[in-house]
Amino acid sequence: MFFAVITLFPEMFEAITAYGISGRATKRQIATVSCINPRDFAEGNYKRVDERPFGGGPGMVMMAEPLAKAIIHAKQLAEQAGCVHAPVVYMSPQGKTLNEHAVQQFVDYDGLIVLCGRYEGVDERLIQHYVDQEWSIGDYVLSGGELPAMVLLDSIIRRLPDAMSDEQSHIQDSFVDGLLDCPQYTKPDHFEGLDVPEVLKSGHHANIEKWRFLQRYQRTLDRRPELVEKVTLTKQQRKWLTFLDDSKN
């Protein structure tokens, strides 16, 4: 999958291209990340990409022209990479909140162009003419769009075919089926008075699967009850829930 990231700080994306699952996927060309600096498309000796906002107010606003040229260049790179559909995504506090369903939709694309804002944001006309989607990673303010963009890229890349050494890993992640993940344990068996649940050491796969589901369901019910309402349970899972109800009686 091809990614073009429009950012004033391309060096930050070494965190994606050089480390972890996304780094390995990049080295194996499962994912390609190309960073484009809008300063390269700015005019004048100072290569300015920001100006004061019309109407007054604090801070600076990123100018439309250099960003538009950067996006056009990104689209050319996407076309050269063979992308049929590479939408332009702007990471913005005003966008829809990113979730697992949205990530899976992105995985189905063959390319993505991600715009990272800075300062007080970008000129609205740029958004109107060039941006296809706006996405947020939460209701809080960051210094720029680079960290949200890295969150987006990492969440997509780890879902790409062959990106993970164990294909079952992402299937068992939190939110994939609407539930949070279950508790995880490793060696040693005993740690500061706490023991690993015996069922996990039993080797009985059916019992382990049931235990993990019940843990996931109860954890989601306790911490994110609004998610439970959206979950579609299998016949077996509904049967397992009777054990959870019986344990409370």
Swiss-Prot record:
UniProt keyword terms in alphabetical order: Cytoplasm, Methyltransferase, S-adenosyl-L-methionine, Transferase, tRNA processing
Residues involved in S-adenosyl-L-methionine binding: G117, I137, G138, D139, Y140, V141, L142
Catalytic activity: guanosine(37) in tRNA + S-adenosyl-L-methionine = N(1)-methylguanosine(37) in tRNA + S-adenosyl-L-homocysteine + H(+)
Signal peptide (residue range): none
GO terms of molecular function: tRNA (guanine(37)-N1)-methyltransferase activity
Entry's Gene Ontology BP terms: tRNA N1-guanine methylation
Major location category of this protein: cytoplasm
Gene Ontology CC, one term: cytosol
UniProt xrefs under CDD domains: TrmD-like (cd18080)
Keyword Plastid: no
Pfam families, per database record: tRNA_m1G_MT
Record's function text: Specifically methylates guanosine-37 in various tRNAs.
Similarity remark: Belongs to the RNA methyltransferase TrmD family.
NCBIfam families, alphabetized: PRK00026.1, trmD
Assembly and binders: Homodimer.
Name of the protein described by the UniProt record: tRNA (guanine-N(1)-)-methyltransferase
Native species: Acinetobacter baylyi (strain ATCC 33305 / BD413 / ADP1)
Taxonomic path: Bacteria, Pseudomonadati, Pseudomonadota, Gammaproteobacteria, Moraxellales
